[in-house]
Amino acid sequence: MYNMYPLMLNLNKKVVVIVGGGKIAYRKASGLKDTGAFVTIISPEICEEMKELPYITWKQKTFSNDDIKDAHLIYAATNQHAVNMMVKQAAHDFQWVNVVSDGTKSSFHTPGVIRHDEYIVTISTSGKNPSYTKRLKQALTSIFPKLIKKLSRTHK
């Protein structure tokens, strides 16, 4: 298997489709805030938090292949592995797909992100251990602003 290559993407005016409406789909959608992406959620139902996101379009339906035909980035984020695999199989080779139920089937992974002013740090286990990534992000979040402040004083 090849190693993952880290990137920062400009998603302004890009189409992002999230298939699923639960907590994981919500986390993916909330991470897209302020990106300028056109975010569409495909799911018969969505969690209450998702309903509060003003930048999403919700299509209240089950997944069909046509739902992702124009997508640049796709999250298969349902609680049903078979549906997630249907999404993966329906995608074209040029589309980037994240299968939340099986990282080995994903063409990209969303890292943990820490933002402070104009600085961004991402943390990843290349999809192998998302819960560890989350714990590491939580630990580093409190340290990061102090570190930036300290380094900026010594590198002026």
Task: Please place each PLM-identified region on the residue numbering.
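Short beta-strand and adjoining strand-loop segment in the mid-core
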Residues: 40, 71-80, 119-128
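Hydrophobic, well-ordered beta-alpha structural blocks that scaffold small-molecule cofactor pockets
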Residues: 1-53, 58-61
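A short, aliphatic-rich alpha-helical micro-motif
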Residues: 11, 67-69
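Short glycine-rich, flexible loops that bind phosphorylated cofactors or substrates
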Residues: 66, 82-84
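Adenosine-phosphate binding glycine-rich loop
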Residues: 10, 114-156
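A structured beta-alpha segment of the ubiquitous adenosine-cofactor-binding alpha/beta core
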Residues: 61-67
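ADP-ribose/adenylate-binding Rossmann-like module
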Residues: 73-77, 84-109
